[in-house]
């Protein structure tokens, strides 16, 4: 494997060098852009090192916001975000949550409930409708909004370099599907940029990390939790060669979701205290959004933050305190959910926790102390690397890759190998999924297979292209269909039809079928015309495949879940009975409540050894819901102590 990988890398290098020699004069300086959900960042490889470029406000990260003022002026970046509260209906953000998705996508429908601007359906896609001044309304595709942000990043780089920029490397979440990648490339084109590469954000972060650590083989886990997306990737770095071994994540989890939970909490609280529903006033909601985000940032370094808003709603002021403990309680399920993709990535790459050499935290949300604690505990106390600014790491890596494409000699022999997230194949007789490219195969890649006709004198074969992990195509996702016609009459099994799958560096799939006898060919390119899978569907398919492949895995999971509940209950019981721990700190009323809840669960366990996984989880959740408020109240702003939950709930067997 290693020899073939190195050989492939050398070939890639030679080809890339030769190709880039031809292009070098055309491309000029290639920039690296991290096009984020909430913030974007641009970097360039110059004089042997990466420069992250500050914008006209002196900030190294720029809000991914676009606004249209009543006077007809368009604002991008800081200026747009700064007037959000006074002009919420015409200030557009979160375009990355909509890009490459269809109108009916459940996540789009969920999102538009919370966005202050109008999202409408057009050509089965979500479009953004704003007032552009002078009483005129206009609709924009998400790609156009992203293009405006990319234009801002392009201008930022041009001001710094003193020359035109025409080529870029742009990053996307590893779990972005084909339609989302294609739409991101389109946004670049609209912005006047030739997007030479779309690379995965965690991969870019690992490049940033790996530049100065090239000796020997290392397993790197990149945990990337940003404003709107979450990605986990496992990479191996071997003497400058990067290979993405596995990826997982959620394109719909990030800092904004944490903000949303806090906002909903305060909106309910305000309604309870005053009887008034703030949701009716878009401006008040956006004021709250801005202040909640500030408070969240403050809680990364302090234990409580005040939220003060003058003339918040109907002339009344708003004044509340948010403690770190409350912030964590409101988001605990979301925080914990970040561990599942970490576990999945380890399983997919056949590695144990102890095999991970470095953990890299990327994205502003990894500054949250609880997230850092959960990651550290999951890896049995291993400290994550802190050498990279989490906001800039992705742009840094993109700039290094841009340096490689510019033909910059100082990047050395850096090579980047990405993977496809799902198995790709064709349907053969009986509805069988014949796999050509297994999931987690390094891309770019090309695989061919010879098939034949199923009946005598068959003049046409239909090639159906699928992605998914199940053995039958009916359970997988159809990407596209095409026919190869004009096959000369022959007995079944005689014609030789060569089917070739080719995935390029941007993860875009081309399928070709050729009749070897006549040289007759046909092909299909799977781009965003066909709606590719959502990450939820990808996850469901992978889970389904595993579930149907081995029922005993389900049994093991049931046992693990039962053990989790049992360990949690007994750990609490021991702590309640220990005067040095919880026992000495609880009021008699709280102690009685907790003891009763714990005993109930222990008794239930004894009589329900064969209950379902869901039952065990539900019982654990019930217990958590009783225990956590008591612990939070007890420890107030200092945050809860370890209640045994942290020790047990992530105790995965590998």
Swiss-Prot record:
The modification Phosphothreonine is found at residues 518, 643, 648. Residues 644-654 have a biased composition (Acidic residues). Disulfide bonds: none annotated. CDD domains: ASKHA_NBD_HSP70_BiP. The modification N6-acetyllysine is found at residues 125, 213, 271, 326, 353. The modification N6-methyllysine is found at residues 585, 591. This is Endoplasmic reticulum chaperone BiP. It comes from Ictidomys tridecemlineatus (Thirteen-lined ground squirrel).
